[in-house]
């Protein structure tokens, strides 16, 4: 298109009236469908293709016009725009007369101002025509072609609907206040239907559904919201009525599982699981547990596949393998054993230069302690001190299990004793090297060779005699030969090549545990592998928790502990048992799972033992021997190890007639609840190194509960043994008191036969037991009914005197018979 080419006018339809505007662009350039108003203000008309809206706005051309020209024609433009609005308003009323008048008025106005209008238009075109001429034809052709392609593929109804949406978008975009019905035809490609929107009528959801409707039948009927709602409800009912296909799952079943947990694992209703259990004859609710076999039957009946898992697998995480390259030399762990007062504690005092013996009672170590001694050459030795009384055999056994070397202390002036033999047996069972320290060599009149000979009897043979046991004479008091003892320990440890990995999660053994007011649970542990750090989560037996603080044997707080280092830790939820293995785990959940598993195992074991005891009691009752007495006890101690030792020793007391029952045992002072339990069960409360609280003492006085305090264990055991002995039935024994020879028989009226007798030995008493012998054969055993001296009744007749006797309910007596007289004596039994 050239500059001289004439531009044909374009019709713009307003209602039923047509108003001819000058200077529209050629229809072939549909991309620039716009109308120049009087003052060159551009009125944009959107040229839309169905499904693809293309709008080319020439506002830039408008903005680039001479601002002075626009201002001069502003008033004229407003007048023309007002006429257009009136025309649109009249088109709604469908008044042909008014529409015709407006049309004529517009034509007259057009002719009057044509010259000015033409000059303004020519100037605008002249300024911008050169810039857009090159692209105009190409853009317009492409748009028209796209419109034709898309229009041919879309139904007429849908075209009109989308055209409506386009028109609404135009109004919204350009802020047209009054909405006249417009009809615009561009090359007969797109027809915009007439739309009448009253100002008072609001836009509703139904209008949106109507515009977006895919109805191709051309019905044109608007669907109501109620109809749409009914259709949605129908779809919902259809979905609900469809039964979902059941999903069969693979269920992992542990050794014990709750009914509710099983239902969740299978995604089944709890009621269905309970029904299956009822079919198997089991009545259970959702909170109860069932065994793995029953759970497998239920899951199989419901169509699921089952995978059995051992609950003990939770402890597999505690298994750690050390790499050879990670191993490092560690300090030896030495256990000191021996008899009471043979000098074990004094030896430790001398080795670690501290005095702990002064606090002991009876020369006996009251609980296990662990100490680390650093030698002059920076080498270290860890010592574990076990008590010397046989009551602590179990504690010494645990000490032997964690030790590398055992030192058996023997007093040179006392020799081999019971605890010495016991310590030897523990060391042999542990399979560890033995060093015999012959103590107190500073005393006069000692015989070391005699000690060695006594040890030979127990297969403890020294190196000089071809054995593998080292004998070292020492004096703990005078500190004689202590350096030789240390050298022997280091020599054996080098031969053993003791190594452990300081890397990875720590593990070890519990040496001792207790509860201290203000500090909570205190646990002494020995690290055997890895490195224990503050903040680690550990599991020890059924106890677990986070390590809050670590204190070494010197009383200093430390941040980590390596192998062979004993430390006291805080943070466990309860008191573990001495000898329990401890392990560091990743998180508290793992520790809790392991603890719960171990608690269940302990309960099952306890139930099994209780069932066995009940069966034994039932058998005793069936046999008629139901005279079993019971001694209930409540034991409170300062440390957990003492509880185990006391309980173990008491339960070993032999008695088939007295059953010792420990109702409760714990660490800490005696409380009011302990007294209440003792009152209702008639138990004795025993406190070892602890005392009762004030309210507990008051309650004990009111309820007459027996509370006994002890600080030495063997005194406690002896007292309990005496109490049990007093509960035993006494032994009834015959005690011989004399013999009588029958010399003459007398028949007395109303009395019967009286035997004239002579007391040959001892003394006879009225009411005593008698045995009648004829030719040295016992023919009667009974009771002496009558004893007379001449005509007088007497209580007793001594040797060398004559008397008359008669038996109770027996008269077959003859001259020459011999009578043995005895008394029944009760003797108190001892355990």
From Swiss-Prot:
**G1: annotated segments:** 338-345
Q: Which UniProt keywords apply?
A: Cytoplasm, GTP-binding, Initiation factor, Nucleotide-binding, Protein biosynthesis
Q: State its location(s).
A: Cytoplasm
In this chain, GTP is annotated as bound at 338-345, 385-389, 439-442
Q: Which Gene3D superfamilies match?
A: P-loop containing nucleotide triphosphate hydrolases, Translation factors, Translation initiation factor IF- 2, domain 3
What ranges does the record give for the region G2, renumbered to this chain? 363-367
Q: Give positions of region: G3.
A: 385-388
Main location class: cytoplasm
One function term, GO molecular function aspect: translation initiation factor activity
Region (G4) residue ranges read 439-442
List GO terms (cellular component aspect).
cytoplasm
Q: Where is this region: G5?
A: 475-477
Domain tr-type G, by residue range, is 329-499
Domain of life where this protein originates: Bacteria
The UniProt function text for this chain reads:
One of the essential components for the initiation of protein synthesis. Protects formylmethionyl-tRNA from spontaneous hydrolysis and promotes its binding to the 30S ribosomal subunits. Also involved in the hydrolysis of GTP during the formation of the 70S ribosomal complex.
**Per the similarity annotation, which family is this?**
Belongs to the TRAFAC class translation factor GTPase superfamily. Classic translation factor GTPase family. IF-2 subfamily.
Name this polypeptide is given = Translation initiation factor IF-2
Q: Please name the taxonomic classification of the source.
A: Bacteria, Pseudomonadati, Pseudomonadota, Alphaproteobacteria, Rickettsiales
């Amino acid at each position: 298109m050239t500059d001289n080419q004439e531009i044909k006018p374009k019709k713009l339809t307003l209602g039923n009236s047509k108003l001819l505007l000058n200077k529209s662009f050629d229809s072939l350039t549909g991309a620039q469908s716009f109308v120049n108003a009087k003052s060159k203000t551009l009125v944009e008309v959107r040229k839309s293709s169905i499904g693809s809206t293309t709008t080319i706005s020439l506002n830039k051309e408008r903005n680039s016009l001479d601002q002075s020209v626009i201002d001069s024609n502003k008033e004229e433009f407003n007048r023309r725009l007002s006429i257009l609005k009136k025309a649109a308003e009249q088109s709604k009323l469908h008044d042909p007369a008014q529409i015709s008048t407006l049309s004529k008025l517009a034509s007259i106005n057009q002719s009057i101002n044509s010259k000015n209008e033409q000059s303004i238009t020519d100037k605008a075109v002249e300024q911008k025509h050169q810039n857009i001429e090159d692209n105009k034809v190409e853009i317009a052709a492409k748009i028209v072609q796209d419109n034709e392609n898309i229009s041919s593929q879309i139904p007429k109804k849908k075209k009109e609907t989308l055209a409506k949406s386009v028109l609404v978008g135009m109004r919204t975009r350009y802020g047209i206040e009054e909405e006249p019905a417009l009809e615009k035809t561009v090359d007969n490609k797109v027809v915009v239907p007439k739309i009448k929107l009253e100002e008072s009528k609001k836009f509703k959801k139904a209008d949106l559904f109507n515009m977006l409707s895919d109805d191709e039948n051309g019905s044109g009927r608007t669907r109501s919201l109620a109809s749409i709602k009914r259709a949605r409800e129908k779809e919902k009912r259809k979905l609900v009525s469809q039964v979902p296909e059941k999903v069969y799952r693979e269920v992992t079943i542990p050794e014990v599982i709750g009914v509710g947990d099983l239902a969740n694992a299978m995604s089944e209703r709890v009621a269905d699981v309970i029904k299956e259990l009822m079919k198997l004859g089991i009545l259970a609710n959702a909170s109860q547990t069932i065994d793995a076999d029953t759970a497998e039957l239920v899951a199989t009946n419901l169509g699921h596949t089952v995978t059995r898992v051992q609950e003990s697998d939770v402890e597999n995480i505690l298994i750690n393998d050390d790499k050879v390259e990670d191993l490092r030399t560690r300090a030896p762990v030495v256990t000191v054993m021996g008899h009471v007062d043979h000098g074990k504690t004094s030896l430790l005092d001398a080795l670690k230069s501290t005095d702990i013996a002064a606090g002991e009672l009876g020369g006996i170590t009251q609980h296990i302690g662990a100490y680390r001694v650093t030698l002059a050459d920076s080498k270290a030795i860890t010592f574990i001190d076990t008590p010397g009384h046989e009551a602590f055999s179990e504690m010494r056994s645990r000490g032997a299990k964690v030790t590398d070397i055992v030192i058996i202390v023997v007093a040179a002036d006392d020799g081999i004793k019971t605890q010495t033999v016991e310590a030897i047996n523990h060391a042999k069972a542990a399979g560890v090297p033995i060093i015999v320290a012959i103590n107190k060599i500073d005393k006069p009149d000692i015989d070391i060779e005699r000690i060695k000979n006594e040890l030979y009897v127990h297969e403890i043979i020294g190196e000089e005699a071809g054995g593998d046991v080292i004998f070292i004479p020492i004096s703990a008091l005078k500190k004689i030969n202590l350096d030789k003892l240390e050298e022997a320990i280091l020599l054996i440890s080098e031969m053993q090549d003791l190594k452990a990995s300081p890397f990875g999660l720590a593990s070890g053994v519990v040496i001792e545990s207790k509860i201290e007011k203000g500090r909570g649970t205190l646990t002494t542990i020995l690290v055997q592998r890895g490195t224990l750090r503050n903040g680690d989560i550990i599991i020890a037996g059924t106890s677990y928790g986070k390590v809050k603080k670590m204190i070494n044997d010197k009383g200093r707080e430390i941040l980590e502990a390596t192998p062979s280092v004993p430390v006291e830790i805080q943070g466990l939820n309860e008191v573990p048992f001495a000898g329990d293995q401890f392990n560091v785990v990743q998180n508290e959940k793992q520790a809790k799972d392991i603890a719960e598993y171990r608690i269940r195992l302990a309960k099952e074991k306890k139930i099994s033992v209780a069932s066995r005891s009940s069966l034994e009691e039932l058998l005793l009752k069936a046999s008629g021997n139901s005279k079993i007495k019971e001694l209930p006890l409540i034991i409170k101690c300062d440390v957990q190890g003492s509880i185990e030792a006391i309980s173990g020793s008491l339960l070993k007391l032999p008695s088939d007639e007295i059953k010792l029952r420990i109702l409760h045992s714990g660490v800490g002072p005696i409380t009011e609840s302990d007294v209440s339990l003792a009152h209702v069960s008639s138990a004795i409360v025993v406190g070892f190194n602890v005392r009762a609280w004030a309210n507990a003492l008051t309650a004990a006085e009111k309820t007459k509960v027996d509370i006994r305090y002890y600080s030495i264990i063997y005194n406690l055991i002896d007292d309990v043994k005496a109490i049990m002995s007093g509960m035993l039935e006494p032994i009834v024994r015959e005690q011989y008191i004399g013999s009588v020879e029958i010399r003459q028989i007398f028949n007395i009226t109303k009395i019967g036969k009286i035997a004239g007798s002579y007391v040959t030995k001892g003394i006879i008493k009225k009411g005593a037991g008698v045995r009648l012998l004829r030719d040295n054969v016992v023919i009667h055993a009974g009771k002496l009914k009558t004893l007379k001296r001449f005509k007088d009744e007497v209580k007793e007749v001594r040797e060398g005197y004559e008397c008359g006797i008669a038996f109770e309910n027996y008269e077959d007596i003859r001259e020459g018979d011999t009578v043995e007289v005895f008394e029944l004596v009760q003797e108190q039994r001892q355990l």
